[in-house]
């Protein structure tokens, strides 16, 4: 199977909700700190190359519902995937099948973690949005015609962002954390 090793690292309420008032309580904030430290802290439990969230979680925490600044007359971009910084080291993968996120930068910061943005799009996303991403240096992969093809997305992520481990001189296994927490501070 040509897919990255994916594991879910979630913070949720006892009723299964991933968003809610519980996150603002002292206990919720303490759990949020532990959530970050386990996955991203100075000595993380996971040694991953990126994490993945959906469009709404991305909008809630990073793009804040900004509209993309599209140029409908942008020159036609080449078909297919675009990987701007394959060796960045840490990646934030945003599943945005319809191309709606209003990014301002090709990187984002989550507490002490800086990551290169990789968008997962479908073929139906127009040239203007793809040109917008390229102009900002944001990577993207195409996974599906009109609906997201999850298997293809995972295969492409492993293929496109897997990189050599400079310490061991070997290929690192592409690993992604799939958080379901709305609290990314």
What are these regions (language model features)?
Residues 51-52, 93-94, 118-123, 167-168:
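Short, hydrophobic beta-strand segments that form beta-sheet elements in well-ordered domains
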Residues 97-139:
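Hydrophobic, well-structured mid-protein blocks that either form specific transmembrane helices
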Residues 124-185:
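A glycine-rich beta-strand to alpha-helix segment
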């Amino acid at each position: 199977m040509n897919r990255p090793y994916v594991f879910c690292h979630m913070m949720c309420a006892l009723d299964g909700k991933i968003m809610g008032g519980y996150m603002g309580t002292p206990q919720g904030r303490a759990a949020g700190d532990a959530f970050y430290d386990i996955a991203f802290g100075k000595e993380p439990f996971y040694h991953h190359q990126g994490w993945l969230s959906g469009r709404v979680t991305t909008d809630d925490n990073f793009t804040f519902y900004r509209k993309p600044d599209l140029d409908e007359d942008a020159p036609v971009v080449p078909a297919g995937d675009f990987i701007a910084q394959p060796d960045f080291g840490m990646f934030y993968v945003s599943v945005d099948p319809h191309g709606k996120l209003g990014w301002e930068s090709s990187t984002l910061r989550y507490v002490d973690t800086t990551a290169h943005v990789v968008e997962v799009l479908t073929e139906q996303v127009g040239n203007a949005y793809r040109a917008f991403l390229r102009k900002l240096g944001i990577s993207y992969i195409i996974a599906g015609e009109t609906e997201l093809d999850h298997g293809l997305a995972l295969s492409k992520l492993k293929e496109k962002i897997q990189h050599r481990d400079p310490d061991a001189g070997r290929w690192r296994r592409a690993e992604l954390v799939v958080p379901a927490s709305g609290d990314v501070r």
